[in-house]
Amino acid sequence: MLFLNAKFIDLDLGANAVIVNEEDLKGTSYYPQDRVLIESHSGSVLGILYSTKTMVQKGEVGIPVRKMKGISLKEGEEVNLRHAEKPESIQFIKKKMDGQVLSPNEIRTIIDEIVSKKLSNIELAAFVTSTYVNGMNMEEIVEMTKRMAETGDMISWEKSLVVDIHSIGGVPGNKYALLSIPILAAAGITIPKTSSRAITSPAGTADVMEVLTNVELDEEELKRVVKATNGCLVWGGGVNLAPADDIIINVERPVSIDPQPQLLASVMAKKVATGIKYAVIDIPVGKGVKIKNEAEGAKLARKFIELGELLNIRVECVLTYGGQPLGRAIGPALEAKEALEALTDPKSAPKSLIEKAISLAGILLELGGSAQIGDGQKLAWEILESGRALEKFNQIIVEQGGTPKKPEEIELGKYVEEVRSPIDGYIVGINNTSITNVVKEAGAPRDKKAGLLLNAKIGNKVKRGDILYTIYSGSEERLNSAVNLARRVYPVNVEGMMIERISKF
């Protein structure tokens, strides 16, 4: 056992990290990454041990303030450190790494220990990798989904019909929800939209909406907003919905993987937790997104529908074109601006954005009884064109704590680089992966003002010197790095009509 004095530090290492000077560890049985219990007169909390030469002095233990829930300490107070038992779920993670099927109890134990932060980031990464490599059967996914929902807030509603739209993501600029949700809410349909922050894309719905208003609402605030407006657009982590999901996402994000079992459970756990009865799942298909072809998309759709049936949620899936970005704007601020422009003047907005938004909203208008089968898309367009969707969107912004803005009032990164066409020709390809990587290199999604604006899309004719796209960043260094990356990965591909001249055989 070690006796040390608590020192509060502002550092987030993911798990409940505790930091000890390496001099205090010499000659002991304590090693970095050991699991330890921090004990004081007020209680105890589990932590993962890290060592340092300079961050804390000999005789101190560094405790990240934001992570030490469950214990009340004063700085300088003496605490005890002792070895903690290894989590039970470690053996079950190894079992999944070996490709075996997990029992319901084993899955519940893993999720419980993720939520209680008994697992280190390394152990979490092992679990995520095991499901990425070996997958899960439907029984495992159902159990994981239920437990992910049960370990967080479970929201109930006065209305019996509550709906949701969700995209599995992967498409840069996928901002459809900022149009679809206010369309549905304006029609009187209850749609409490909760979403994750970006995992593999440069901006999630929550990242984009955060440019315009507060997205971190608790359960009571969320219910108040929905009661006032019929809808909301908030971050699921702020409401404590399926808390294991955001912990897992933080492990997935650095390596840009989203294992299908986690994808299914992540999406549907939040539907269970928010009391959803009808859900439309958008599955983008195309080069550079998660689902490469229609056959693969149909297979995933069947899994979503089956999982929904087992959870008593009616699910319809839509395969959408994902071969290039949705609209022209990629990155939180740029996407928020484009969404506002589309709500303000839908006739001038990118057709791909409008078509996707009203198509998805139209399905739920039909399922919810607001429109006859086949008339949903028409009604969605009428609500959008009339200005009712913009009015509802601004109402949601206000209720969530923001102030409505005009598109031109949204600030973009002050460091800008225009990339021009080297030849006369046509846009023959836009690489989603390259676009995503360039925008991330520019600083998105953490830098809300970072992004990329496409001046041309596939099939457009361009002349030499025309602007192909513009990169924005809040950092000159990040902008230069993004531009250098763009020169290597060619986000936009231009080709002339003449491929090669051949005069001899």
Curated annotation (Swiss-Prot):
The disulfide bonds in this chain are none
Binding locations of AMP: 170, 196-201, 205, 266, 290
Q: Which reaction does it catalyse?
A: AMP + phosphate = alpha-D-ribose 1,5-bisphosphate + adenine; CMP + phosphate = cytosine + alpha-D-ribose 1,5-bisphosphate; UMP + phosphate = alpha-D-ribose 1,5-bisphosphate + uracil
Q: What is its EC number?
A: 2.4.2.57
Q: What's the domain of life for this entry?
A: Archaea
The molecular function terms of the Gene Ontology recorded here are: 1,4-alpha-oligoglucan phosphorylase activity; AMP binding; pentosyltransferase activity
GO CC aspect terms: cytosol
Pfam families the record matches:
Glycos_trans_3N, Glycos_transf_3, PYNP_C
Q: Which residues form the active site?
A: 258 (proton donor)
BP term (GO), one: pyrimidine deoxyribonucleoside metabolic process
InterPro entries on file: AMP_phosphorylase, Glycosyl_Trfase_fam3, Glycosyl_Trfase_fam3_N_dom, Glycosyl_Trfase_fam3_N_dom_sf, Nuc_phospho_transferase, PYNP-like_C_sf, PYNP_C, Pyrmidine_PPase_CS
Assigned keywords, A-Z: Glycosyltransferase, Transferase
For this chain, the family text in UniProt reads: Belongs to the thymidine/pyrimidine-nucleoside phosphorylase family. Type 2 subfamily.
Q: What does this protein do?
A: Catalyzes the conversion of AMP and phosphate to adenine and ribose 1,5-bisphosphate (R15P). Exhibits phosphorylase activity toward CMP and UMP in addition to AMP. Functions in an archaeal AMP degradation pathway, together with R15P isomerase and RubisCO.
HAMAP family in alphabetical order: AMP_phosphorylase
What is the protein name given in its UniProt record? AMP phosphorylase
In its UniProt entry, the species of origin is given as: Methanococcus vannielii (strain ATCC 35089 / DSM 1224 / JCM 13029 / OCM 148 / SB)
